[in-house]
């Protein structure tokens, strides 16, 4: 593995353990040339997953899009980066556990909203407003009432 600091190939693993999600391995590495340490993660290679968009276009699954949407919904909320990462991990695990080659954005959105609803009401409403494309205040209020009725 190349060192991200000096690009040397002369690196070695100094510690290896399961990552927090137990689906990957966290490795601490040391560059023998520059002496700097860095972390890598090893994950099982998964089958390519195709996401079906609302307009029926298809594109390859991209975890960073889920992360970006959740981060935007949680912006300026008292939610740690670890909590957001765990939420994204949970959604991703559930997506891949289905063992399907294609998944719709609507299903991914519902999985995210289910978790955000339990995590933070404001983040949930923010995500839902974009995901469900609220056209006016009335649809927004209807969603708020539904959420408040379930609490």
Swiss-Prot record:
Any one GO BP annotation for this protein: negative regulation of DNA-templated transcription
Keywords assigned by UniProt, alphabetized: ATP-binding, DNA-binding, Metal-binding, Nucleotide-binding, Repressor, Transcription, Transcription regulation, Zinc, Zinc-finger
Pfam families registered for this protein in UniProt: ATP-cone (PF03477), Zn_ribbon_NrdR (PF22811)
Cofactors named for this entry: Zn(2+)
Cofactor note: Binds 1 zinc ion.
Record bears the keyword Membrane: no
Organism domain of life: Bacteria
Record carries keyword DNA-binding: yes
The ATP-cone domain, residue ranges: 49-139
Family, as annotated: Belongs to the NrdR family.
Function comment: Negatively regulates transcription of bacterial ribonucleotide reductase nrd genes and operons by binding to NrdR-boxes.
Protein name stated in the entry: Transcriptional repressor NrdR
Annotated organism of origin: Agathobacter rectalis (strain ATCC 33656 / DSM 3377 / JCM 17463 / KCTC 5835 / VPI 0990)
Gene that encodes the chain: nrdR
